[in-house]
């Protein structure tokens, strides 16, 4: 089946939506896959009303086609902004997304990447501001290090389904990153809905200091927290103490199911942009840790519509305040 919609098919979609017919039935009627119809309506409907008309849809499709074949011009103002945001730790995708969110003209992220690599070929250094993708780091030495039976462990299967929706603030994920030769450790906590992160240097990798630092780090948002999810490391053996002092529920992933804490794994990767693999964490200061935390909480995220975690946090809190008042 074709993935491209013709002008005649757009007219048919417009008419059938008015009947109304389901998107699946429309797809069968015009001979395309239902995903093609869903994508067509989503891309070419009216942004404000959500309604679909053949005329508007065709104009949008024609404009998109023209832009695709038009060479993008990287203006001096764009170059200046790109360099500024690269130095702040933004990726090309974040530069484009944030610029469009703020109504600032910007080329595509593909064009930015091409410009960066052209700069590299000329001996430039812009590429050094890009994150290194695909790098793996050892958090606890061997695969089985730090694992064992945790008394009172509550499995992730018991966690409320609402946590999966990522709609409310206060469903957190927690982890530790261990430095070179097991020297020093860092505690990372992040919120699933907003990507807001708390990073703290640990005085030790044992369960008692981990619990103490976790409670201290979250004291200001204690009344907003619902759950915390961790892996099965022994450093979280004092989970009941954390749960009691924060008045929340504490859950554990299944062994070696790191994807069940996907947001936290991603956050740890972002931290590695600033603290590379092989770094002795005992050399990292609390001031540096706070600087990294501030950077990540004020960096736009694609999954947040290029809002920053702090902006998304304020948005959710404000929405909840309005709902409560109503």
Curated annotation (Swiss-Prot):
One GO molecular-function entry: transposase activity
GO CC aspect terms: cytosol
Domain of life: Bacteria
One of the protein's GO biological processes: DNA transposition
Swiss-Prot/TrEMBL keywords: DNA recombination, DNA-binding, Plasmid, Transposable element, Transposition
Keyword Transferase in annotation: no
Domain spans labelled Integrase catalytic: 156-317
Coiled-coil regions listed: none
Similarity comment text for this entry: Belongs to the transposase IS30 family.
Primary role: Required for the transposition of the insertion element.
Protein name in the entry: Transposase for insertion sequence element IS4351
Species: Bacteroides fragilis
